[in-house]
Amino acid sequence: MYFCEKYSYMLPEFLPCSSLFADSKCTPVHFNKHEKMHDLELQKYEIALIGVNPILSDLFRHKFYSLSLDHFRMLSIIDLGNLKDVSDFNVANTVMHLMDLKIIPILIGSSLSHFTQMHLQCSQVLMPHRFALVSDNMSRIDDLLISHSMFLKEFYSIGVQRHLQTSDSIHSISKILYLSEFRKKLSNIEPFTRNVDAAFFDLNAIRHSDFSASYNSNPSGLFSEEASSICKYFGSGDKTKALFISSWKTEQDASGTNELLIAQMVWYFIEGYGLKKTDHSNHKKNLTQYIVEIKNTGIQINFYKSEISGKWWFEEPIIDMDHSNVLIPCTYDEYLNTVQEQVPDRILEYLN
């Protein structure tokens, strides 16, 4: 179980999918035809699609089910329909219940307040967690997401644009991957997504020319291909348990191009999940070790590489002798920089 067993869940009610989608013969997705969650045999599913905003969610479905889903016939996916009660508590409660069943929920048309409520409920059940936010502006982070952060071990901000930030919006708990750093090399995002429990994708992070339905109409931001790539990285994350996708404006594009992009983002998230090769990083016998000694410092950093997936980690120094060292995700480039005695700041944070 992911969460404390004493936590009591109120099973949510759904508005089942329209027959327009449920009658589709060309998709491996199972469609919910029940209003009560307890009428479903949920344990057999791996991924659940959930509509939070019913109008947006059905627009998304029109595009998603037009894509080639044959790639996912080996996966167990269910479209639960649209939630009846979209209060912050009920949405977060639904996500936590599905996560307890080891089902990854993908929420369409969600809000940051839902994400915040999930953080609060994780803290209530004493669950350490790591969250990620894809957004152009860190000021969108709700104050509650930063408060009560004893159990929020790490918070990653991805795609942030420097010119939109104020100095007080950069909180010490947040690890930032600026848009410019992400664009230098796409794989820079991989350590940020590897250990994330849940991610919120703010569609305002996508530039207006690629996504005209954003609320901000920002001329700069992620390209559409980058948005899909980020979702694929989240899907392939070893610990990813939930994906929230924000709401958007519907009147900007009668052709449905915006909804098609969101459908593609979800498609690549599912592909990432299907293709991932989970590495049991706690079992070092399955990893190749590389020892790097920093000259004139006495510092030794142990790196590990999985020969299965090519993923890299470095070993956090022992703090408590009663516990084994923690392996922190990193990139091959960070390993090479360390070998050349140019230790990245992100690694130095763990050594100091």
Predicted feature descriptions by range:
Residues 3-245, 249-352:
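Conserved alpha-helical scaffold segments that buttress catalytic/binding sites
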